């Protein structure tokens, strides 16, 4: 799974808000947004299967990334977005060396097939599809310091957004199909011996609920997310993780987005999340911050006249 799939950020237009592909916000036609996002996460304890433990041989594992993100409004109801992160991972103890480099490029299409309002309520349905694939030849079989899993992913997501005045609730469900990957050895053992360098990667399901406050200049949300690998196996005792492990996690978090009144088009973003339970995953706490700018490819008057 690439970092981009979980953290790709793009920008809206009607209210000029940064968003993830999980957000119920769309750009206007002919608007383009670009910006950078910084993410920091670390963990010391992790789950070896269901056993929670630490490992003094690696100490604290830290991951950082800087992503460039872009989003374009093809129409008011159809957006295309892309992102590419540079990632560097390291541990505070032991002999494992730092891993860094460009990870996976990601492209998504976001579409509103249906929306309806009644009284002060509004319900909007979204369909999102995309893919991610590695752009560099990074080492896959060096977890937990590998910068990515190395698979090409096809992602499908359905989402429903409910809004009453400034209160919102958004629920989404995603299915991620992952290609097989090749590692730098001719055999490996999961629950049995495989005399090949090709690893069968299990698919992934991802669910999220986000709810909070959405206004013209501010969005504040609480998030509950669940990542479930649909297959795989547990890390064996005192062994390193493997790309096809059964990696599950439940995360809680917050998301804040602020549009500056005195600088139209500029948006600031901040967020945090914490893993509360997991399987074959580190108990990570993460923080992110970013800045984005929105502008029209065509004049605003031209874009508005096209809606008449």
Describe every region a protein language model picked out.
Residues 29-35, 79, 83, 102, ...:
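Outer-membrane beta-barrel architecture
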Residues 30, 62-66, 100-105, 123, ...:
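Residues that define the transmembrane beta-barrel architecture of outer-membrane proteins
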Residues 22-30, 77, 115-124, 166, ...:
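Short loop/turn motifs that connect adjacent beta-strands in outer-membrane beta-barrel proteins
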């Amino acid at each position: 799974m690439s970092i981009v799939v979980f953290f790709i950020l793009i920008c809206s237009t009607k209210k000029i808000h940064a968003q993830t592909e999980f957000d119920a916000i769309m750009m206007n036609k002919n608007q383009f947004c670009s910006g950078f996002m910084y993410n920091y996460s670390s963990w010391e304890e992790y789950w070896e299967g269901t056993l929670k433990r630490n490992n003094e041989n690696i100490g604290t594992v830290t991951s950082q990334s800087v992503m460039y993100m872009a989003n374009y409004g093809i129409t008011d109801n159809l957006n295309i977005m892309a992102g590419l992160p540079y990632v560097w991972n390291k541990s505070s103890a032991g002999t494992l060396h730092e891993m860094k480099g460009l990870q996976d490029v990601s492209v998504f299409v976001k579409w509103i097939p249906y929306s309806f309002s009644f009284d002060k309520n509004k319900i909007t349905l979204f369909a999102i599809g995309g893919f991610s694939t590695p752009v560099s030849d990074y080492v896959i079989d060096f977890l937990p310091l590998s910068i990515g899993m190395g698979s090409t992913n096809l992602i499908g997501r359905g989402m429903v957004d409910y809004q009453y005045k400034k209160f919102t609730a958004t629920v989404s469900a995603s299915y991620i199909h992952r290609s097989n990957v090749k590692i730098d050895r001719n055999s490996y053992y999961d629950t049995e011996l495989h005399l090949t360098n090709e690893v069968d990667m299990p698919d992934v399901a991802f669910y999220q609920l986000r709810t909070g406050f959405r206004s013209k200049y501010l969005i504040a949300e609480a998030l509950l997310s669940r990542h479930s690998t649909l297959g795989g196996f547990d890390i064996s005792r005192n062994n390193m993780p493997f790309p096809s492990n059964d990696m599950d996690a439940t995360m809680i978090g917050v998301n804040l987005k602020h549009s500056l009144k005195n600088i139209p088009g500029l948006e600031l973003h901040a967020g945090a999340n914490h893993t509360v339970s997991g399987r074959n995953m580190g108990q990570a706490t993460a923080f992110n911050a970013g800045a984005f700018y929105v502008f029209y490819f065509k004049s605003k008057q031209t874009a508005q006249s096209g809606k008449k």
